């Protein structure tokens, strides 16, 4: 099932970068033979922020490796979708409809997050979902809690999202 193009969420990019699942990597190679990876500008923001946080917390001897990974990521970017007025309107509707994240801040994660960081990540997911809706691309993700909540909210208030199809979600683990 290599089709597309798809919009890749930050969680999917991270998952594909870490996985050793041969079927998933075969799927990704097949996808990349036909399409560029397409992401929202928000995904770039989240990834650069992640590299910068790692760099700040790293020992000096590890910082060069982190910076090299950041530069490689930026040099390898495919299509980056901006947050234009259409995506901003849809994201505003999502944020008004669903102001609070469905899950609490991460505590078991290597870098525990505060309530305000969790709210920011939730809003970033709303912007990424809005980009997927406006571009009419399925969203590949590894964050079912947030994106399923967003999709359900949109389905409960379709009048707030005229002329947009449903939010089509593909969990990256299902591609393997």
Language-model features and meaning:
Residues 108-113, 117, 121-138:
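Acidic, metal-associated active-site segment
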Residues 1, 129-176:
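Acidic, PIN/NYN-like endoribonuclease modules and their adjacent C-terminal/linker elements
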Residues 76-118:
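Acidic catalytic patch
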Residues 10, 85, 106, 118, ...:
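Conserved glycosyltransferase catalytic-site signature
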